[in-house]
Amino acid sequence: MKVAPLSVVTLEYTVTDEHGEVIDTTVGKEPLVYLHGTRYLVSGLEAELEGRSVGEAFDVTLTPEQAYGQYDENLVQEVPGELFDGMEVSEGDTFVAETDDGHRPVTVIEVSEEFVKVDGNHPLAGVTLGFKVEIKDVRAATAEELAHGHVHGAGGCGHDHGHDHDHDHGHEHGGYCGGGHHGHDHGHDHGDDHGHGGCCGGGGCGAKGHQH
């Protein structure tokens, strides 16, 4: 069976940045399992996987446009600290903010007495990414998986989208990083929920969660 829309695909991968530094890998961990064609992965990686078969391995370099877009200075904004309702806020914290375009993940990059500066760019915006991928399994999705829009079972990318190794430290990264008015969402977390599948998993370096 080939990789096709609504097939369940199991991947092993390693992701590197422009300098060859490893950003994330599943080697030695659980592989990534996801429902293909649901925009879970960034567009460039999903396009490369389309039509491939179990056992195929490949390397691909994705431009920012194929991954998380170019870095947009307009997505860096100062918001009044009072919007956080007295919550303790530190640099590196990530919040799901309410904007004119809906809920958007933002990362705190600076805290002053009156303002909090947040960055709505994905942490990998503007970065060219190298993927080394091997397809371990491809199967048809179950009726339940199709109904829910995600994979069930071990390694699945369904309920726990905290695969962001990354850079969001287990906060609720999901959705486009937009501008507009930044409110706040109390789903803020200081824990490190890296999980497996950081780069290809929800919001991580292959995920479509922050896709531009």
From Swiss-Prot:
Predominant location category: cytoplasm
Protein name according to UniProt: FKBP-type peptidyl-prolyl cis-trans isomerase SlyD
Entry's family note: Belongs to the FKBP-type PPIase family.
Localization per record: Cytoplasm
Positions in coiled-coil regions: none
Catalytic activity line of the entry: [protein]-peptidylproline (omega=180) = [protein]-peptidylproline (omega=0)
Highest rank taxon of the organism: Bacteria
GO biological process: protein refolding
Span list, region PPIase second part: 128-150
Organism field: Aeromonas hydrophila
